[in-house]
Structure formats: structure tokens, C-alpha cells
């Protein structure tokens, strides 16, 4: 019996829409990362992108537990000497609510070209509107 290996041309990718309202950041991010990788499919192959497209709406209404809203820090660098900037969860969710979920999911995906390709299949929007109605995404309850 031969081991099955998925071929990139034969992979079927579906579109799903996830409502992040009232969801916990980490629990939502792990399920999204799992679906972006394709681990929920029987034909999962580690070196082939077998995952689905995920559209996340209401990213501004996501929450974290405990004191993490004030204590969790997000760092970025401007590229100049001494240019390390930090922002806590509360400020980042006000400034760029999409980035919070993007950063969380990106850290759960493989590092390298395959992980970057998987990350591109996630579309995050702060509000309820998204421009992917033509793809007819199915509602995914997480």
C-alpha cells in the first residue's frame, strides 16, 4: 500500500466565514490555523498547502481573558536604531483590530514560504462587511 500524497493541483479549497464576536483570541486562532493548514481534512499532507480560505468578520469584538488586555504587549520595529515600539492589546484593538488575530494565527503556522502562503488565505475584517460574497463562503461555527 502506498502512502497518499496530495498534489497542489488536486486540492479542493472551500471558503468559510467566521464571526469573531465574543470569541477568545487564542481559542479562535488555533482553530483558524488548523483549518488554514488543512489538518481537518483526510488528505492532509504536511508539505502541501491543503487548507481552506477563512474570512473573519467582527475582529474588533474579540476578547482575551484575565489581565491580558492591559498586560499583553505587541512589538514592532521601525527599522531605525532605537526604533522598537510596543503597544498593549487594548490600544492595538482600537488602532488596528485585524492585526491582533493576524499576529496570533501567523505564529501558529509554519515558518517559511509554505506558512506565508497559508497565511495569505486568511482575510480579516474589523466589521461585519467583507468583499468575498462572490465566493459564497459557508458559515463556520467555532
UniProtKB/Swiss-Prot annotation:
Keyword S-adenosyl-L-methionine applies: no
One GO CC annotation: cytosolic large ribosomal subunit
InterPro entries registered for this protein in UniProt: Ribosomal_uL13, Ribosomal_uL13_bac-type, Ribosomal_uL13_CS, Ribosomal_uL13_sf
GO function terms (MF aspect): mRNA binding; structural constituent of ribosome
UniProt superkingdom: Bacteria
Membrane-spanning intervals of the chain: none
Keywords linked to the UniProt accession: Ribonucleoprotein, Ribosomal protein
Chain coiled-coil ranges: none
GO terms classed as biological process: negative regulation of translation; translation
Role summary: This protein is one of the early assembly proteins of the 50S ribosomal subunit, although it is not seen to bind rRNA by itself. It is important during the early stages of 50S assembly.
Subunit and partners: Part of the 50S ribosomal subunit.
Family: Belongs to the universal ribosomal protein uL13 family.
Database matches in NCBIfam families: rplM_bact
Record protein name field: Large ribosomal subunit protein uL13
Higher taxonomy: Bacteria, Pseudomonadati, Pseudomonadota, Gammaproteobacteria, Oceanospirillales
Amino acid at each position: 500500500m502506498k502512502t497518499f500524497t496530495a498534489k497542489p493541483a488536486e486540492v479542493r479549497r472551500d471558503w468559510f466565514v467566521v464571526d469573531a464576536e465574543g470569541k477568545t483570541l487564542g481559542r479562535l486562532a488555533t482553530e483558524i490555523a488548523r483549518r488554514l493548514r488543512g489538518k481537518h481534512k483526510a488528505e492532509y499532507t504536511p508539505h502541501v498547502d491543503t487548507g481552506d480560505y477563512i474570512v473573519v468578520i467582527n475582529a474588533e469584538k474579540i476578547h482575551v481573558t484575565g489581565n491580558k488586555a492591559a498586560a499583553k504587549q505587541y512589538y514592532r520595529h521601525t527599522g531605525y536604531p532605537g526604533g522598537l515600539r510596543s503597544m498593549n492589546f487594548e490600544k492595538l484593538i482600537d488602532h488596528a483590530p485585524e492585526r491582533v488575530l493576524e499576529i496570533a494565527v501567523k505564529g501558529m503556522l509554519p515558518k517559511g514560504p509554505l506558512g506565508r502562503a497559508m497565511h495569505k488565505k486568511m482575510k480579516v475584517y474589523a466589521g461585519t462587511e467583507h468583499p468575498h460574497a462572490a465566493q459564497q463562503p459557508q458559515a463556520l461555527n467555532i
